[in-house]
């Protein structure tokens, strides 16, 4: 009677996800399903979703780290779209990657043109010192 499931002699392991095997947090299985359903190609290799998932996870971590720094600089504990905007636009590579992306409620970067700034002339500085 070897047909039943018994505890003795069972060598079944708990299944590990492809995300866990790759050491990722983002879901590899979901990315694979989306690649198959998206009609990007007739066939999808087994390594492609793992690679794409790792790239997506890295980009998300990079953006969130910079946005967290921007939130901390503004003395806030919650990341808002403004912090994402500041993080992306102040980073050269992320700005190049997401240059044509509009972030809702992101605002604009603070920038004052040089011609509009008050001029530092020597006469006004000397006159104020004499008084």
UniProtKB/Swiss-Prot annotation:
The keyword Metal-binding does not apply. Phosphorylated to form H2AS128ph (gamma-H2A) in response to DNA double-strand breaks (DSBs) generated by exogenous genotoxic agents and by stalled replication forks. Phosphorylation is dependent on the DNA damage checkpoint kinases MEC1/ATR and TEL1/ATM, spreads on either side of a detected DSB site and may mark the surrounding chromatin for recruitment of proteins required for DNA damage signaling and repair. Gamma-H2A is removed from the DNA prior to the strand invasion-primer extension step of the repair process and subsequently dephosphorylated. Acetylated by ESA1 to form H2AK4ac and H2AK7ac. The modification N-acetylserine is found at residue 2. The modification N6-acetyllysine is found at residues 5, 7. Residues 1-22 are annotated as: Disordered. GO terms for molecular function: DNA binding; protein heterodimerization activity; structural constituent of chromatin. Pfam families: Histone (PF00125), Histone_H2A_C (PF16211). One of its GO terms (biological process) is DNA repair. Keywords: Acetylation, Chromosome, DNA damage, DNA repair, DNA-binding, Isopeptide bond, Methylation, Nucleosome core, Nucleus, Phosphoprotein, Ubl conjugation. A motif ([ST]-Q motif) lies at residues 128-129. The keyword Nucleus applies. InterPro entries: Histone-fold, Histone_H2A, Histone_H2A/H2B/H3, Histone_H2A_C, Histone_H2A_CS. It is found in: Nucleus; Chromosome. The modification N5-methylglutamine is found at residue 105. GO terms for cellular component: nucleosome; nucleus. There is a cross-link at residue 126 (Glycyl lysine isopeptide (Lys-Gly) (interchain with G-Cter in SUMO)). The modification Phosphoserine is found at residue 128. The record marks 119 as: Not ubiquitinated. The [ST]-Q motif constitutes a recognition sequence for kinases from the PI3/PI4-kinase family. Core component of nucleosome which plays a central role in DNA double strand break (DSB) repair. Nucleosomes wrap and compact DNA into chromatin, limiting DNA accessibility to the cellular machineries which require DNA as a template. Histones thereby play a central role in transcription regulation, DNA repair, DNA replication and chromosomal stability. DNA accessibility is regulated via a complex set of post-translational modifications of histones, also called histone code, and nucleosome remodeling. Belongs to the histone H2A family. In contrast to vertebrates and insects, its C-terminus is not monoubiquitinated. The nucleosome is a histone octamer containing two molecules each of H2A, H2B, H3 and H4 assembled in one H3-H4 heterotetramer and two H2A-H2B heterodimers. The octamer wraps approximately 147 bp of DNA. This is Histone H2A.1. The lineage of its organism: Eukaryota, Fungi, Dikarya, Ascomycota, Saccharomycotina.
């Amino acid at each position: 009677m070897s047909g039943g499931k018994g505890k003795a002699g069972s060598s079944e392991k708990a299944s590990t996800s492809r995300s866990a095997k790759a050491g990722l947090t983002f879901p590899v299985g979901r990315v694979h399903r989306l690649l198959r359903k998206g009609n990007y190609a007739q066939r999808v290799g087994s390594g492609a979703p793992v690679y794409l998932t790792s790239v997506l996870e890295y980009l998300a971590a990079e953006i969130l780290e910079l946005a967290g720094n921007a939130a901390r600089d503004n003395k806030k504990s919650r990341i808002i779209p403004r912090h994402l905007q500041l993080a992306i636009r102040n980073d050269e590579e992320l700005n190049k990657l997401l240059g044509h992306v509009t972030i809702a409620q992101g605002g604009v970067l603070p920038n004052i043109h040089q011609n509009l700034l008050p001029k530092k002339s020597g006469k006004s500085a000397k006159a104020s010192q004499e008084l």
